[in-house]
Amino acid sequence: MESMYLILAKLPEAYAPFDPIVDVLPIIPIFFLLLAFVWQASVSFR
C-alpha cells in the first residue's frame, strides 16, 4: 500500500513538463465556440 502512495507522490514531478499544456486546456472549449461562430458566418448562418 505504501508503494502506491509513493507512485502518487511522484506523479506531479513526472507531469511537470506538461504544465504548459494543462494551463491551455481550459481555453480549448472557447476556441471550439469561436470556431462554431466562424463556421456559421462562413456559411452565412443558414
Swiss-Prot record:
Keywords: Chloroplast, Membrane, Photosynthesis, Photosystem II, Plastid, Reaction center, Thylakoid, Transmembrane, Transmembrane helix. The chain crosses the membrane at residues 21-41. It is found in: Plastid, Chloroplast thylakoid membrane. GO terms for biological process: photosynthesis. Residues 1-9 form a propeptide. Pfam families: PsbK (PF02533). PSII is composed of 1 copy each of membrane proteins PsbA, PsbB, PsbC, PsbD, PsbE, PsbF, PsbH, PsbI, PsbJ, PsbK, PsbL, PsbM, PsbT, PsbX, PsbY, PsbZ, Psb30/Ycf12, at least 3 peripheral proteins of the oxygen-evolving complex and a large number of cofactors. It forms dimeric complexes. This is Photosystem II reaction center protein K.
